[in-house]
């Protein structure tokens, strides 16, 4: 038997797939000034929400951190601030987080004159943290938890090898009195600046205002 198909009616195939998007919620340029002021480590870290919309069921949001850029800052404080400023403008004027100790003290007035939003963090050896005075133990513990939760992704950045090597030298040790101490083994003059830069940025973005860049 022949069945006549009404005019204009076409066969349609419905593909049942979940929609997935990523949204950059926040960006941070994180800087750990070099111990001797020669080459400092700067990372661009993004806080990303991955949204999955299943055909059936609730929307699933997953937050993770993605390291998308790196740069060695060379020269004196003024020269390094010029490099920070140029990068800051290029990547959309994100939050700048800097270790406020040592060479980092000199960054702040220069970057302030350039109208760069800076969040200085002073590290100490205690166990509790305030807004700007941060315990190294808490900061590194926070980074360790994120890695254990697989919430950090390292992109194809120029200094990926240096960052990974620095993170691999990262150690947590329990002392006899029960305190947890973190350290980074120095190798050929490299003091773990890349790992410290990573930990600083992750700490700075753990809370605070969200700067929505949009889904992509």
Name the predicted role of every residue range.
Residues 1-123, 130, 137, 150-216:
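RNase H-like, metal-dependent nuclease domains and their acidic two-metal-ion catalytic environment used
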Residues 133-136, 140-142, 146:
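Conserved RecA-like P-loop NTPase helicase motor core
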């Amino acid at each position: 038997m022949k069945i006549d198909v009404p005019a204009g009616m076409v066969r349609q195939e419905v593909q049942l797939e979940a929609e997935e998007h990523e949204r950059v919620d926040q960006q941070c340029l994180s800087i750990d000034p070099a111990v001797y002021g020669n080459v400092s480590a700067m990372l661009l870290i993004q806080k990303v929400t991955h949204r999955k919309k299943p055909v059936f069921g609730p929307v699933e949001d997953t937050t993770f951190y993605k390291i998308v850029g790196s740069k060695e800052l060379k020269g004196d404080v003024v020269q390094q601030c010029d490099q920070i400023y140029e990068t800051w403008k290029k990547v959309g004027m994100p939050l700048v987080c800097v270790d406020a100790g040592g060479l980092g003290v000199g960054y702040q007035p220069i970057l302030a004159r350039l109208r760069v939003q800076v969040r200085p963090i002073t590290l100490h050896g205690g166990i509790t943290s305030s807004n700007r005075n941060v315990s190294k133990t808490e900061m590194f513990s926070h980074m360790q938890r994120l890695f254990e939760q697989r919430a950090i992704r390292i992109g194809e950045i120029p200094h990926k090898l240096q960052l990974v090597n620095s993170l691999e030298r990262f150690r947590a040790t329990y002392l006899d009195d029960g305190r947890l101490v973190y350290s980074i083994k120095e190798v050929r003059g490299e003091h773990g600046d890349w790992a410290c830069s990573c930990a600083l940025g992750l700490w700075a973005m753990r809370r605070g205002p969200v700067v929505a860049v949009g889904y992509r």
